[in-house]
Swiss-Prot record:
Keywords: Amino-acid biosynthesis, Cytoplasm, Diaminopimelate biosynthesis, Lyase, Lysine biosynthesis, Schiff base. It holds the Pfam family DHDPS. It comes from the Bacteria. Catalyzes the condensation of (S)-aspartate-beta-semialdehyde [(S)-ASA] and pyruvate to 4-hydroxy-tetrahydrodipicolinate (HTPA). GO terms for biological process: diaminopimelate biosynthetic process; lysine biosynthetic process via diaminopimelate. It is found in: Cytoplasm. The record marks 44, 107 as: Part of a proton relay during catalysis. The keyword Amino-acid biosynthesis applies. Belongs to the DapA family. The lineage of its organism: Bacteria, Pseudomonadati, Pseudomonadota, Gammaproteobacteria, Enterobacterales. This is 4-hydroxy-tetrahydrodipicolinate synthase. It is an enzyme of class 4 (lyase). Homotetramer; dimer of dimers. The active site is at 133 (proton donor/acceptor), 161 (schiff-base intermediate with substrate).
Length: 292
């Protein structure tokens, strides 16, 4: 089962917007050293929307190579066309990745039956473990617990990243899935409470810059030491929120650069650099967390 603090890793780039291998290695080494449970490569935070399919696959494979078996790598493989999601997923069938994170189709807003058929078709074309990803604030599409329950009966659909921030979803989904189905928060600000209600971990933006703290918080929560976990979470709470003061991954890329984890905070259009006001806000949150 996928558990603990899983990082939604940024994709570091050089000043020309090309993927920076040296910075990627530095990031991976940082997460290995600080107890991160797994890496999600080229998800939303990894700027999947501005990478070509070939670049997307190249970054995942580079991440897998640089990880060198030290930490599991999960590939982001979502698309809003089922055939495209299948094609992207199949690129990794024999790669050695730990699984795939597949977002609900965005913009075209399928019905619940459409969502079921979409994920069922992907699962039928691969043996890789599949983690569903529900983030309606970005996709315009909300996968309901009943649909998750139906999909959980498919052998290689093994978990969900639930990013609504609606904590009632934990109980509703738990009632419909088996105990081995991984319930992962996709919302850092509510992840601690999500785990207290029975979740197994978080796929996190904050972990990019606070890997040890997030790993410790998740470990303590898993051990039932919620008072201790909450002490860490309280210190990180401004960061959980302020990393979204501008569109993700703009603030977290800047924060990674500020902490010396990457060489630049270069983004690809239509994403633009963090504003001066954004720097002040995120910098203050980093200081509150004890990271600066």
């Amino acid at each position: 089962m996928f558990t603990g603090s899983i990082v939604a890793l940024i994709t570091p780039m050089d000043e020309k917007g090309n993927v920076c291998r040296a910075s990627l290695k530095k990031l991976i080494d940082y997460h290995v050293a600080n107890g991160t449970s797994a890496i999600v490569s080229v998800g939303t935070t990894g700027e999947s929307a501005t990478l070509s399919h070939d670049e997307h696959a190249d970054v995942v494979m580079m991440t897998l190579e640089l990880a060198d078996g030290r930490i599991p790598v999960i590939a982001g493989t979502g698309a809003n066309a089922t055939s495209e999601a299948i094609s992207l997923t199949q690129r990794f069938n024999d790669s050695g990745i730990a699984g795939c994170l597949t977002v609900t189709p965005y913009y075209n807003r399928p019905t619940q039956e459409g969502l079921f058929q979409h994920f069922k078709a992907i699962a039928e074309h691969t043996d890789l473990p599949q983690i569903l990803y529900n983030v309606p604030s970005r996709t315009g599409c909300d996968m309901l617990p009943e649909t998750v329950g139906r999909l959980s009966k498919i052998k290689n659909i093994v978990g969900i990243k639930e990013a609504t921030g609606n904590l009632s979803r934990v109980h509703l989904i738990k009632e419909l899935v088996n105990e081995d189905f991984a319930l992962l928060s996709g919302d850092d600000a509510t992840a601690m409470d999500f785990m207290q209600l029975g979740g197994h971990g978080v796929i996190s933006v904050t972990t990019n810059v606070a890997a040890r703290d997030m790993a410790d918080m998740c470990r303590l929560a898993a051990e039932g030491k919620f008072d201790d976990a909450r002490i860490i979470n309280r210190r990180l709470m401004p960061l959980h929120h302020k990393l979204f003061v501008e569109p993700n991954p703009v603030p977290v890329k800047w924060a990674c650069k500020e902490l010396g984890l990457v060489a630049t905070d270069t983004l690809r259009l239509p994403m633009t650099p963090i504003t001066d006001a954004g720097r002040d806000i995120v910098g203050s949150a980093l200081k509150h967390a004890g990271l600066l």
